[in-house]
Amino acid sequence: MDTDRTGLAAMPLHAITAELGEPGLRERLAIETATFPDPDRLRLARALELAARLHAADRRQREPYVNHLLRVAIRIICYYHITDPDVICAALLHDAVEDHAAELAASGSQPDALAVLAAQFGDRVADLVGDLTNPRYEPGRDSREQYREHVEASLDASPWARVVKASDFTDNGLGLIHATGPAFSRLAAKYAPLVPVLAGLIARPDTPLRDDVKAHILDQFGRAQDRFTAILTAHHAGYPPHDAGQPPHDAGQAR
């Protein structure tokens, strides 16, 4: 990689992704964790390699899925000012059980997969991942409604899981910049109902983030809601989603 470490540390996450891809994001995570105690850095490295192995065949739009996991973790360190290794491990592994329970545990059950994570990374990491894992939905009920209900209930009692979810939600919203066709309206319909739920959770006094960080996240959520509304309005009116306003302000740029 030609970019020096000083330059890489100052680059927005979207620029690292576009110009340097996974190697650049891995290096940025290494920079951000360079001062962590050795045991914490080693545990984070193990979490990243497990996540990379589990999601090796997964893609997000035009990129490897691991890029998403890296950005979620880096954003928590750089922009949320969180250095708790359990929280960062959970960020790297937050989709592992939901998407790959069968690779973690022979039974394929989510509780057994979480037990494997607990044995490897500790109970707190497994608990956070569990709070961030969507259950298998009931047939016959609207999946988006069940998703919203699960997020609201699971994060209500898990302040640190809210931190990971805020970064995950911010990064997921970036998919709307690159999505085309029906994907625009599907994603907007999925995420729009979550904005007020997550905003309320982030604003709570027990959410362990600085006030200025909360304010920034809430501003991003508000702009994301405007974007989702524009996409859905255009969809119902029959306009191309590309004309539905602009991407959320600085989501995935500096932060």
Segments (PLM) and residue ranges:
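Active-site helical microenvironments for divalent-metal-assisted chemistry
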Residues: D2-G245, D250-R255
